Amino acid sequence: MKLIDTHNHLYLEDFDPEQDQLVTIAKESGIDTLLLPNVDTSTIRRMHDLCDRYPDFAYPMMGLHPTSVDEHYAKNLKETESWLGKRVYCGIGEIGIDLYWDKTYQKEQKEVFEEQLRWSIDLNLPVAIHTREAYPEVFDSLYKVGADTLTGVFHSFTGNEAELEAVSYTHLT
C-alpha cells in the first residue's frame, strides 16, 4: 500500500528544529509522499526549499489560504498565481473559505477561492480545500465554477451529514 500525507505544512518555521527528523520519521513510518499546500506569499520559498531537499518525497501545491486573504489580497493572489508558470505543482491549495475566526473578508475569500478553482480547472490540477463554518459558501462556489470537473480533497471535514452528502456528488473526497 502506498501512503500519502495529503496535507501538511512541515516547511513552516515552527518545524525548523526537527524538520529533517520529522521527514525521516515519516519515511520510516511508511509514508511515501508528502503533499505540501502553500499558505501565502511569505511561505512559498520555504515550501520550495523543503521540496528541493526531498524531490522524490515532498511535492508542492500552490494557493492562497483563506485566512491569508486581507486588504492586500489582489496583490497576493497575483503573486501566488505568477508561480504557477515557474514550477511544477501537484495541486492548487490550500484554498477555501474560513469564517470561523473572522468574517471581515468574506466577500474577498469567496472571490479568491473561485479564482483558484478556475486555476485548478485550467491546469487540470486537484484542489486541497480548507473550509470552516462556510459550507454553504464553499458549495455555492464549487457549483458556480464547476464542481463536476474538479478533483481533490477537503483536508478537514467538520460538516454535518447533509454536507457530507453534498460532497459525495462531486469528485472531491
For each feature predicted by the language model, list its residue ranges.
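Conserved small/polar residues in nucleotide/adenosyl-binding loops
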Residues: 170-173
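A short, structured active-site edge motif that brings together acidic residues
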Residues: 59-69
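An N-terminally biased module of ancient metal coordination in phosphate/nucleic-acid-related enzymes
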Residues: 1-59, 75-81, 85-167
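A generic structural signal for short coil/turn motifs at secondary-structure boundaries
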Residues: 13, 69-70
